[in-house]
Structure formats: structure tokens, C-alpha cells
UniProtKB/Swiss-Prot annotation:
NCBIfam families: DHPACoAdixog_DpgC. The gene is dpgC. It holds the Pfam family ECH_1. This is (3,5-dihydroxyphenyl)acetyl-CoA 1,2-dioxygenase. It is an enzyme of class 1 (oxidoreductase).
């Protein structure tokens, strides 16, 4: 078994054929090695050296040809491919640029510590596409379009006003879409299923003409520590990250560019000339806590009500990953000093302290939550509210700024989830409650 890194002989300005041949040689090296955790130091060095070189070449290639690649994959930007569809199309049309479906299937069968880290190559590709001035905005638009699952469920929801899914349920009452996180066994910890259910629910709420306002709240838990109590969200499911079941494309990126971005911008349609999207006001209600991804969500809602015994945290430093788009949004609410304390230092903010009012609009006793929610929903119900929240969001979060952030996030988060520190930390967390 060789431990020599292949000589790739890559030169600046390489064409796709040369890139594909070099990628094949790297794959042959990796296929001949044991799994990452079983490699000798020499084997690790050989793999790392080869991957560094091919990834530098992939970066150069996609940065030079992003618009051309995207135009080919989308027939001149006439087709709207979602993230997962785009990376699969790229794997077929540009061998060696991103991992093949077979390679990704093999990765999905392994724990995080046993993976080769091929999602990093997807991150390189998506950073290049999102950074491109024409391709990037088109990809954002593609991710704002309703999902096929939502379109299939829409007639049922319009008729009955109820859709129940594994991780979320949606009920329409008096013009309000009540969206409830209902993973009662794991404190609403986030995984790919939750992201799929949440995007479906957000699409339905936005597409249903009878819905005027949306509301998100955590359901009642069966988890022993919070049995009988409502919980908003415990953040990313660290057990699933350790087991290799938190994907870059279908969770970490889809979450940001899918349902969260739709809460901000609305769902894209081919309808009225008045607006390219259907958007509506949203309220969040926080019981018990909003940790990690739960706290990130609060930054995109128009009104937040919290119980006085709740708390908020972004434990990025503890978990080792990037807290979604919180690094982009949080300082607008808190200022840069407090944002750094929360993100870099892991500061927890309780609802009863003054700084909490930078994150939430109302703090009420737990027994008054229902009344406060209904009052706030009534205040959000109006055409003028909808028009003004659209303009506020446009001013506070210009699409190009968000796109540039997400371009870099695509790669940096991919690198983080394969960092040795993250793999070690989540392995320890896996024995905990999430």
C-alpha cells in the first residue's frame, strides 16, 4: 500500500480535462488507504497533501469558470436547481469537480470521524457559484421557490388548515399559521428531517392565501428533563453530527438558504407583477430556551415574545462550528461587543436581564404567554405591516451582502464540521441529551 502522494503536476489556468485526471489520481490514492481514523501518520500526510493540492485546483477552476459552469447546468439560467440538484448535476457534467453520488453515498454511511471530508469539495464549489455575480443571485432565487413537497401538500392544507409532520405541525386558525416544533423527545434539536419539515411548513404558510401572519413556537416535551413543558429549540442535534447525519448541503446550507431565508424574503413565485415573492409577518414565541440554531432563528422574526424564565445562547465556541448566519445578523441587534461575547465567549442571556431586550420584544411571565402571543399577532396583521417589514428587511439585509456571507459560509462551515476539534467535541456531546 503506497503512502506517496501522487504527483499532480497542476499548472495555473488548468482546463477541466486536466482537473478530472488529477482528481482521479487522488481518488485512487484515497481508495487504497484505510479509513481516516485508521491511517498511519505517513498515510495521513499523503492524503492531506494530495487533498490540499486538488482542492486548490478545484478552487481555481470554479472561481475562473463559475458563470460558465452554472449557465451550462441551468440551461442559461432558465432552470432553477436547488442546492442538492446543483451539486448532483455538477458531479455528472464536470467529473472531478465535486464528489460523485457514489462517493457521497459512501460518506453518508460513515460516522463523522470516519469520513473523507468530501463535503469540503462541495463547499468549494458552492462558494464559487454563490460568489459569482450572476450565478449567485439566481441560486438564491432557486432556493426561495416552493419545494415539491409543499406544492403537493398545499391543496390539503388550503382545504383542512392542518398538516402534521414528524418534526413540525402547522395549523391555520383565524388567518394565523401556527407552526409548532414537535420533536418532543429531543427538545426540538435540529436535523435534516426538521429542516425539511420546516421548509415545507413555511412554504405552506406563505402560499396559503388565507394565512396573513405566521407564528413559531415549541411544543410540549416528553423529554424527562422538561416533561410537560414547552421548549423552543435546543439547536443542532449533536448526536447526529457525531454519527455523520448532519449534511452540509441538505442541512447546514439548506437551512439558511431555504426556510430561514424564506421567512426573511418570502417564497418566490411566477405570479403578480407587484412583487416576485409572497412574504408575511412572523412572530416567534420562546418557552424555556432558544439554544444555537433556536437563538439564530429569533434574528429573522418580526416580533419575539419570551417567557421570563427562558434563556438564549449561541454555543459556537463550545461546539466548534459556525452559528449559521448569526455572525452576519446578531451585531445589528446587540452591537459588536455583545455579539462577540455571545458568539466567541458563549455568553448566555436570560430573559429577565436588560440585554435580553436587544433580542426579544416582550418578556412576560410563563402563564401570560398565550395572551401576549395573541395580542402581538393581532398587531402584525395588516397590509402596511407586510409592506414595511419587506422594506426594513431589504434595508437591513441587502441580498448581495447575504449572498457574499453565505458564499464564504459554504466553505468555512464545511471545514469546521471536519475539524479535529469539532469531531472530538461532538463525540463527547453524543453521550448527552441532544
Amino acid at each position: 500500500m503506497t503512502t506517496d502522494s501522487p504527483t499532480l503536476s497542476l499548472s495555473p489556468g488548468l482546463d477541466h480535462r486536466a482537473l478530472a485526471k488529477a482528481a482521479q489520481r487522488v481518488d485512487e490514492l484515497l481508495d487504497g488507504l484505510p479509513s481516516p481514523s485508521a491511517r498511519t501518520p505517513a498515510q495521513r500526510e499523503a492524503a492531506s497533501s494530495a487533498l490540499d493540492e486538488i482542492r486548490a485546483a478545484r478552487t481555481e477552476y470554479v472561481e475562473a469558470h463559475a458563470e460558465e459552469i452554472y449557465d451550462r447546468l441551468t440551461d442559461g439560467r432558465t432552470r432553477y436547481l436547488r442546492l442538492d440538484e446543483l451539486v448532483r448535476a455538477a458531479a455528472s457534467a464536470y467529473p472531478g469537480l465535486v464528489p460523485t453520488e457514489a462517493q457521497m453515498a459512501a460518506e453518508r454511511s460513515r460516522r463523522q470521524a470516519e469520513k473523507e471530508g468530501r463535503e469540503i469539495d462541495q463547499g468549494i464549489f458552492l462558494r464559487g457559484i454563490l460568489s459569482a455575480p450572476k450565478a449567485g443571485p439566481h441560486l438564491l432565487d432557486a432556493m426561495l421557490r416552493p419545494t415539491a413537497r409543499a406544492l403537493e401538500l398545499l391543496p390539503e392544507f388550503v382545504e383542512t388548515g392542518v398538516v402534521r409532520m414528524e418534526a413540525a405541525s402547522l395549523e391555520r386558525r383565524d388567518g394565523v399559521a401556527y407552526l409548532t416544533l414537535c420533536r418532543d423527545d429531543c427538545l426540538n434539536a435540529e436535523d435534516a428531517q426538521q429542516v425539511d419539515d420546516m421548509e415545507t411548513a413555511v412554504d405552506l404558510a406563505l402560499l396559503d392565501p388565507a394565512v396573513r401572519v405566521g407564528m413559531l413556537r415549541g411544543g410540549v416535551m416528553s423529554h424527562p428533563r422538561y416533561a410537560g413543558r414547552r421548549v423552543f429549540c435546543a439547536g443542532i442535534n449533536l448526536k447526529k453530527l457525531s454519527s455523520g447525519d448532519i449534511p452540509l448541503v441538505d442541512f447546514l446550507l439548506r437551512r439558511e438558504l431555504g426556510y430561514i431565508h424564506k421567512i426573511v424574503r418570502g417564497v418566490a413565485t411566477d405570479g403578480s407583477w407587484r412583487a416576485r415573492v409572497i412574504d408575511k409577518p412572523w412572530l416567534a414565541a420562546v418557552d424555556s430556551f432558544a439554544i444555537g440554531g433556536g437563538a439564530q432563528l429569533l434574528l429573522v422574526f418580526d416580533h419575539v415574545v419570551a417567557a421570563s424564565d427562558a434563556y438564549f445562547s449561541l454555543p459556537a465556541a463550545t461546539e466548534g462550528i459556525i452559528p449559521g448566519a448569526a455572525n452576519y445578523r446578531l451585531s445589528r441587534f446587540t452591537g459588536p461587543r455583545l455579539a462577540r461575547q455571545v458568539i466567541l465567549g458563549g455568553r448566555r442571556i436570560t430573559a429577565d436581564e436588560p440585554d435580553a431586550r436587544l433580542l426579544v420584544d416582550q418578556v412576560v411571565p410563563p402563564e401570560e404567554m398565550d395572551a401576549a402571543i395573541e395580542s402581538a399577532l393581532a398587531a402584525l396583521d395588516g397590509d402596511a405591516v407586510r409592506a414595511n417589514r419587506r422594506m426594513v428587511n431589504l434595508a437591513e439585509e441587502p441580498p448581495d451582502g447575504f449572498r457574499r456571507y453565505m458564499a464564504e459560509f459554504a466553505l468555512q462551515q464545511a471545514l469546521r464540521i471536519y475539524g479535529a476539534d469539532v469531531i472530538g467535541k461532538v463525540g463527547g456531546f453524543a453521550a448527552g441529551s441532544r
